């Protein structure tokens, strides 16, 4: 390593060139175009980790079909509050993407988003009863208007012919169906956003690894960065956003901010089965979500998805969650051990004890053979042929451990003075990237927000407005983004 340090400066620094940094960078480039922005990415291209199209399922998470967003309580009531929030949050993402296309800042929306039906599919009387309750709760609300429910095998065969092929007429099945779901290629979208940022003069530094971060006495942050020649750069900045997926927790710990001292992480690896057989691909056009098996964690909800990648359709089934020590796909087996420190030891251990069944489940999942995975796939496609499917290793997710609890969601952690923000967690993740980054603005740029209000409402017409309470505005905005994102074609 060459220790002849060079120095650099920017007003704003983003670590990790994934969908979160690209979204925050885009918002800030619009709000404060005169501010300098630097993005550091340790890999050779943007969007190679969690945001990459092959490392996630590409569902535009809006709670149209994901059953784990509408849980049933002990009294048998189906709670829809989380579903409403996720659906509303996803509308903000659609609005920003629509604005960027309308303004000519990004192009060819068909390269990153497609209209595709979202279907919930269940088996057995208890699950059918649950799905009916869910449908009754959601379908009357304008956010979920157009949702249908059926137990009729003939109708189900129209919605999902591949799944219904060669099924017994006596099987107890049901599905809900809604047309206005989406498949999102977050890799393509991230590349478009980063291209826009570089066009605006923002600096994108690939093959640059941030190895240390500390706050200076004047409140600025000093980053120690290794470039592609392994030369050390000292980079100073007023504001830092750490949005590098599984790489965020180690940097949060190095920052030494109080809010991060007791936080731990639990990495989970993902696998999918992928099918590119044109005959099978042509028989399925939907994202079909099932119900997690008893004892299985939320991240293991099975689904069979149509995907659009590189202009081609394919089918994806999974995910198969499994145990890993790595925080990133291109990470190290020492990631988890090194993340356990004196400050978070008790929290990590408490969460570990509470989640021993999860660890056991993940280890068992890791040991499954391809043929054992095919058995699970055949719950969806009864006559699935092993030769048509290949195992695909997807990305890593790091579940957040806080106060001895494992959080299944997306968390924003900030320094008390608002000079640093960190994005942690997983699903619904990329789908609500705009809402997550608005939370960063709220926590870190609260003094500037009043001056930004008009611009934010121009970009995001439902900003600070409840779409769940305004059916007319929702319908107006839906027509607008469907037209600009070519979802009405």
Swiss-Prot record:
Pathway: Carbohydrate metabolism; tricarboxylic acid cycle; oxaloacetate from (S)-malate (quinone route): step 1/1. Belongs to the MQO family. Keywords: FAD, Flavoprotein, Oxidoreductase, Tricarboxylic acid cycle. The keyword Translocase does not apply. It comes from the Bacteria. Its cofactor is FAD. One of its GO terms (biological process) is tricarboxylic acid cycle. The lineage of its organism: Bacteria, Pseudomonadati, Pseudomonadota, Gammaproteobacteria, Pasteurellales. Signal peptide: none annotated. This is Probable malate:quinone oxidoreductase. GO terms for molecular function: 2-hydroxyglutarate dehydrogenase activity; L-malate dehydrogenase (quinone) activity. Its EC number is 1.1.5.4. It comes from Haemophilus ducreyi (strain 35000HP / ATCC 700724). It catalyses: (S)-malate + a quinone = a quinol + oxaloacetate. It is an enzyme of class 1 (oxidoreductase). The keyword rRNA-binding does not apply.
């Amino acid at each position: 390593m060459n220790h002849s340090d060079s120095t650099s400066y920017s007003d704003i620094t983003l670590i990790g060139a994934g969908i979160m940094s690209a979204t925050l960078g885009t918002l800030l480039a619009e709000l404060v175009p005169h501010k300098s922005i630097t993005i550091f990415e340790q890999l050779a291209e943007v969007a190679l980790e969690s945001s990459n199209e092959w490392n996630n399922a590409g569902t535009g998470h809006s709670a149209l079909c994901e059953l784990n967003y509408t849980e049933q309580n002990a009294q048998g009531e189906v709670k829809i509050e989380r579903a409403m929030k996720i659906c509303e949050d996803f509308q903000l993402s659609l609005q920003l993407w629509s604005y960027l296309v309308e303004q000519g800042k990004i192009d060819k929306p068909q390269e990153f988003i497609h209209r595709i039906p979202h279907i919930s599919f269940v088996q057995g009387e208890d699950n059918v009863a649950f799905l009916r309750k869910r449908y009754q709760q959601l379908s009357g609300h304008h956010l979920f208007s157009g949702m249908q429910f059926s137990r009729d095998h003939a109708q189900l065969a129209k919605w999902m012919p591949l799944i219904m092929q060669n099924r017994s007429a006596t099987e107890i099945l049901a599905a809900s169906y809604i047309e206005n779901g989406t498949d999102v290629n977050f890799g393509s979208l991230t590349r478009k956003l980063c291209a826009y940022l570089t066009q605006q003069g923002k600096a994108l530094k690939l093959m640059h690894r941030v190895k240390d971060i500390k706050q200076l006495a004047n409140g600025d942050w000093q980053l120690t960065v290794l470039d592609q020649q392994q030369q050390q750069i000292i980079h100073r900045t007023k504001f830092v956003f750490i949005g590098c997926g599984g790489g965020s927790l180690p940097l949060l710990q190095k920052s030494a901010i109080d809010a991060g001292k007791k936080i731990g992480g639990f990495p989970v690896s993902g696998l999918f089965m992928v099918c590119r057989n044109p005959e099978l691909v042509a028989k399925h056009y939907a994202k079909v979500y099932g119900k997690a098996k008893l004892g299985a964690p939320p991240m293991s909800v099975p689904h069979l998805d149509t995907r659009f990648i590189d202009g081609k359709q394919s089918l994806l089934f999974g995910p198969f969650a499994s145990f890993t020590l790595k925080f990133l796909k291109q990470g190290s087996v020492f990631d988890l051990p090194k993340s356990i420190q004196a400050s978070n030891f008790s929290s990590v251990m408490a969460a570990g004890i509470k989640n021993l069944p999860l660890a056991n489940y993940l280890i068992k999942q890791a040991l499954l053979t391809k043929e054992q995975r095919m058995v699970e796939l055949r719950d969806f496609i009864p006559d699935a042929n092993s030769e048509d499917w290949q195992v695909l290793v997807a990305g890593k997710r790091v579940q957040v451990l806080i106060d001895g609890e494992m959080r299944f969601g997306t968390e924003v952690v900030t320094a008390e003075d608002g000079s640093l923000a960190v994005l942690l967690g997983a699903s619904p993740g990329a789908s609500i990237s705009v809402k997550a980054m608005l939370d960063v603005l709220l926590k870190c740029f609260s003094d500037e927000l009043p001056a930004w209000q008009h611009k934010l409402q121009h970009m995001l017409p439902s900003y600070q407005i409840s779409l769940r309470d305004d059916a007319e505005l929702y319908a107006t905005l839906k027509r607008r983004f469907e037209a600009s994102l070519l979802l009405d074609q």
